[in-house]
Amino acid sequence: MDGQVTVKRHGDTHFANIGYGYYTFGVSVGYILLLLLLRKRRGTAVPRSRHKLFQMMIDGSPALHLPILLLFLEIAFLGHYSVIDHASVYIKRLGRLSYVLLFLNIFLTLRPNYILSDYTYVQLLPMHMWLSRAISTFGVFHGLAFVIKWQLDNEVSLASKLFNLWNLLGFIVWILLIILLITSTGVIRRRSYKSFYMVHQINAFAISFIVPVHARPGVALPYTITIAVLLGLHALARVSFCMSSAVVHKLSNYQKGSKLVRIKLPRNVMPEHFTPGSHIRVSPYRRSNPLYWLVPSHPFTIASLPDDDHVDLILREHGHFEFEVGPRYSIVHNYEGITALQLGLVNRVTIVVGGTGISLGLPLFRYFKENTDIGYLKMIWTVKSHADLHVLDDFEGIDIFVTQNTTTTPIPGASESWDEIPLEEFELNSMDDLEAEEEHLGESGALLPTTKRKKDPGAINIGRRLDWNVELASFVRSEGSSDQLLIVCGPESLVKDGVQFATDHNIVFYKEVYSF
């Protein structure tokens, strides 16, 4: 009687990538611990290091952090298997790497993130964006490599391989990743950020739960479980930290051509205590509307202080989203911008903002002016048109630069590119004087006794651009000091100039990029 021959269902290398998956997960956890330690060592403010790489490490720059992360992942990528004889092992390993990294990528976007509480959401966003591109690229190459392998193998049919149920699911994920990479390019994002965001949301959810069905051996434990928990925390936060509110008042100056408006919301949309310069996100949809989950909410900076009667927003209106009095809006999140620790450790502060950057500069200027006794405080606001000044009630102490003359003819070379800042450059893109006076007029048309007249600015400059070395000469010390802080907010070109100035003079800086 002939003996039966047992044939293995899978080859000897079927489980070759299990260990690498755990290694990738461990590296991801290690990276989170590294982020935690980098900020914990900064118990006090220090001058920005003249060693660029060290400063990039502290700041969490993806230009340095991503290569370091990938280097550690590459160390164990090539094992004892021959790349030529066991190419499928490394193709599968690339796919597993792509999926396991989803845990880290989703973790970086948690709001609030209680573990990385020393980072703001915006500080972690660049790493999330570049890690997303790396994950998508790994997944695309994983699928492409198998298509090429099957096409070159005369012993298998490409069609039969692709339309095998498990491989078909992988093929669907491959198409989704290609679409995500295409829509994440700068051209597409600038044309339709909403389209990019919707593709991002749908793909993230689909890939998280299709890959576990496709992958062999499975990835459900622990990866899919942890990813599902993080996605659940995202959903819970969007439900728990959401409240409905209507606009109390809208101050505009359309008659004079300004698109800058000031919005007043009820005070209860923010907690009793919050750090000046904090941010909120606003959605025009209710939580029960699917678009609430698929369409991006709009980020804005709180232009008021905790002691004020209302929560103020200063923004530039555009066709995509406009506040109106009457409709109710969903206030989705509030989160810190500059940290309270940074504000408490400085004695000399200069604030330079452009356009809607006033929404960050104004509350910080008021905070230092009204609640602290620092040795030096200066604020500069650059606007394109004199009509934009209507959003402020009090100009006292603010130096203003109007880059267009009174005939609204642009000054040659006066920052024409400032209108071209794309939304995704920084997620916090903060999108008639007669109306302001009406609140203070009696029935006869006379000003009521309680009316406060606008105070004069520190200086106003028409048709002249900011000269950093001149305007900030009194701020600069011969040697950098940890108690100096330059806050710069506005168009990318303004922020870039401010960062360069701070770097040249070894000054601690805080930056945010808004549209002009």
From Swiss-Prot:
Q: Which Gene3D superfamilies match?
A: Nucleotide-binding domain of ferredoxin-NADP reductase (FNR) module
Q: Which family does it belong to?
A: Belongs to the ferric reductase (FRE) family. AIM14 subfamily.
Q: What is the lineage of its organism?
A: Eukaryota, Fungi, Dikarya, Ascomycota, Saccharomycotina
Bilayer topology term: Multi-pass membrane protein
Cross-referenced PROSITE patterns? FAD_FR
EC number(s) from the headed UniProt entry = 1.16.1.-
Query: Membrane: is it a keyword of this entry?
Result: yes
The subcellular location is: Membrane
**Protein name per its UniProtKB record:** Probable metalloreductase AIM14
Q: What is its biological role?
A: Probable cell surface metalloreductase. May be involved in iron or copper homeostasis.
